């Protein structure tokens, strides 16, 4: 039983609707529009919303959307046939009204489609009932029944052939092991000569061995060296004392060499950092987050130089290109198949996950199928333009994270703004936490760093080093004696959730604006550590949960994000589990134009990329520019 069936235009006008079991179809259809149609995720024609399964079909020629909804616990095999039949009949019946494509004509039009729909629904249900059951194949008709007889016939003939081949190979191996270089005709004679001692005698054997040795040396050319080595090895070596190895920093070094403690000047470690402040800070405005720029001046100059030649080529070869024009033609899947295959391979080469590349190309095919092209548009340009629009739309997800605005809102409520960083091992969580701390300090917010990585050795010391250097960049003297950055740590082996709770309470009492919680790196399959992370997030309810991921990963990004979200949902004790809110993409300066990880991560989670790490100084932090990333992704 269907819950509803609705037909509406891409402009939002509902042309016709059938209400079955469900009272209203507004909520599920709006969720479909927000999550699938507007986000360019049309690779799969089904969508699940709460207890309903929605299937849809796009008519790109007339800009129509056909949606059917039913309970997801039901298995209705006739839904695909029904939606195709309704699409075909509705388009043919009201072609004149739809071709006007004006909102006023669609509003004034009367689409009496109830009786036709009920007839198609009844036919679809009956066809599914009377569908012929699949009959089991007989054993006599299968390949397995024919295989034993054929294999017996083949193996009898093959055994003799294999025996002959094996005998030949064994004979060749024996001849090779003896080192004979003579032909097959003379070989038996030589063997007989070797065996016949009375005819040849001992001298003949020596001559034969010497002759074979010379032939072997001439053939391989390395026997002389080996023989010389063997003669050298026969001579006994004079035993001498081994020279003692002198280590650069050995035990005999003096105390000055072994002293690794930081030099103290007037008892302040900040004075030792004064000469390295510019190196630590980096160049650029720290308080202003710049957009990511993936293009270079060389690429721009190349594109500018190629534009005139391209225009000349199109004008000069106009008549030769007329065969490739598809003006005033509706696109079909056969037309786009070869282009989409090239686009899919291009995306995979640019580090997009393989499954996501397939879904993107399928979404573009559904979007363009049946669409009438322009006069001088080719299939390649149309598909490429549609793919670029889809990629830009994916990188601009539903929610936009504005940390500065949210921190000011938390200040008005007199509470600290809490951010939790999570991710796998070695992706740069602590480093990018320090970059974000510097960015917040440059904007005038005080930061408390909570060292909740009680698992990895050296994690607390790493954060202590960052805190000391950030304090040197923003000393209390510049802020009226107020401590702008401080580390809250309780050592190793403690409960991370308890440390985070104490840090938030300490920040509230001391008046800190932001609390940045550093967590231990963990693999997505490590159940105990994922349970501890879910406990930390559930107990402390942070304002923002950021997943830190590398820009180097491809298919692994999909597995990491899916399993992190699944683990947070499974191990959470709350009724509505808290999932990942945003993404921090690190090591973006090491991938050139292979920026596909940004597409993979955003497509999987529908969450925005909040920050992008582009270097090793505190200023190397950027915000994502969707158009620049897509331009780098589509660059050949």
Curated annotation (Swiss-Prot):
A Pfam cross-reference name: SRP54_N
Keyword GTP-binding: yes
Family: Belongs to the GTP-binding SRP family.
Residues annotated with Phosphoserine modification: 177, 295-297
Organism: Mus musculus
Compositionally biased intervals (Polar residues): 302-312
Superkingdom of this protein's organism: Eukaryota
Protein name: Signal recognition particle receptor subunit alpha
Function text: Component of the SRP (signal recognition particle) receptor. Ensures, in conjunction with the signal recognition particle, the correct targeting of the nascent secretory proteins to the endoplasmic reticulum membrane system. Forms a guanosine 5'-triphosphate (GTP)-dependent complex with the SRP subunit SRP54. SRP receptor compaction and GTPase rearrangement drive SRP-mediated cotranslational protein translocation into the ER.
Region listing for Disordered, in residue ranges: 132-205, 217-246, 280-314
GO BP terms: intracellular protein transport; SRP-dependent cotranslational protein targeting to membrane, signal sequence recognition
Compositional bias per record (Basic and acidic residues), positions renumbered to this chain: 137-146, 153-165, 217-238
Quaternary structure, from the entry: Heterodimer with SRPRB. Interacts with the signal recognition particle (SRP) complex subunit SRP54.
Location of the protein in the cell: Endoplasmic reticulum membrane
Membrane topology annotation: Peripheral membrane protein
Region feature (NG domain): 417-634
Gene: Srpra
Protein's UniProt keywords contain Nucleus: no
CDD domains referenced in this protein's UniProt entry, alphabetically: SR_alpha_SRX, SRalpha_C
GO cellular component: membrane; signal recognition particle receptor complex
Binding site for GTP: 423-430, 518-522, 586-589
Modified residues (Phosphothreonine): 283, 303, 576
GO MF terms held by the record: ATP hydrolysis activity; GTP binding; GTPase activity; signal recognition particle binding
